[in-house]
Amino acid sequence: MTQITPQEALQRTIEHREIFHDEMLHLMRLIMRGELSPVMTAAIVTGLRVKKETIGEITAAAEVMREFSNKVHVEDKRHLVDIVGTGGDGANTFNISTCSIFVIAAAGGKVSKHGGRSVSSKSGSADAMEALGVNIQLTPEQIARSIADVGIGFMFAPNHHPAMKNVAPVRKELGVRTIFNILGPLTNPASAPNILMGVFHEDLVGIQVRALQRLGAEHAIVVYGRDGLDEISLGAGTLVGELKDGVVREYEIHPEDFGLRMVGTRAFKVDNPEESKAMLLGVLHGEKSAARDIVCLNAGAALYAANVASSIEDGMARAQAALDSGAALAKLNELVAYTARLTA
């Protein structure tokens, strides 16, 4: 194991030089164990941000975060998928990916959803799940059972990454994006081999998909809407980085490719968790709307990532059927009842 002092690491970032894989492993372990001072931690993560984190640095940091996490052991991972965003897009949309998980599970996928409370949005995935009546305070064993029995397991990030408490005050005080914003989506506690990930900057599409490749992902789709959305957008083209069969492809897709009309993000904007819940439930109750279209498109891509569907188009058709039949709404009700029983 190559040792590097925190001061040497900081000097590297100032000189815009890379911190190599083994060095980053050592440095990240110091941070995760709380062995660096808040000042040094802040300096290093800020330096990395200014320099721009490399694929190697991100991969090594994610490996350490996974190492320190409380894991969820899932037996059958064939169709296991996470649908997650880095957040920070500033769009304040309703919980598109959270709504999508019920559609995905109803259409034959299994979802290990990794999320937390709101940081930059009006409603984080954990806030949304609680508002819907889902108990998010489950043990790793209970989450694994929920995935097996219902097809959905929600993993509340603070319960799975206790070492992050060592950097939480630094992140809060800095108030800017750091490497930790892009590590969360790379550190699914159930090690989902398939993922649909939204990112907040176009440069991250190629970076994150290649980090996922190095971390052993099987089918990964990383997306960035050109209107700034960290989802597949209806308001603009969406940049895509796809890892499949060990090969990365980058391309662009548009709403009209899927027979959908372009709609600006204002159509999905909410001001509080109650509005987000109302829009989400409207979709699950089968209302025809732009909100339904963006959920079907993103759930369809996740079903393709999960190898349930043969393409995004096929996934979208399956998503529409799950909503029209009422199966997606039934899946929400099933999860609410199941998680209530587990802790009764």
Curated annotation (Swiss-Prot):
SUPFAM superfamilies, sorted: Nucleoside phosphorylase/phosphoribosyltransferase catalytic domain (SSF52418), Nucleoside phosphorylase/phosphoribosyltransferase N-terminal domain (SSF47648)
EC number assigned by the record: 2.4.2.18
Cofactor requirements of the protein: Mg(2+)
Cofactor binding note: Binds 2 magnesium ions per monomer.
Residue numbers binding anthranilate 1: G85
InterPro entries noted in UniProt: Anthranilate_Pribosyl_Tfrase, Glycosyl_Trfase_fam3, Glycosyl_Trfase_fam3_N_dom, Glycosyl_Trfase_fam3_N_dom_sf, Nuc_phospho_transferase
UniProt-annotated binding residues for Mg(2+) 2: D230, E231
Protein name in the entry: Anthranilate phosphoribosyltransferase
Organism this protein belongs to: Delftia acidovorans (strain DSM 14801 / SPH-1)
Gene symbol of the encoding locus: trpD
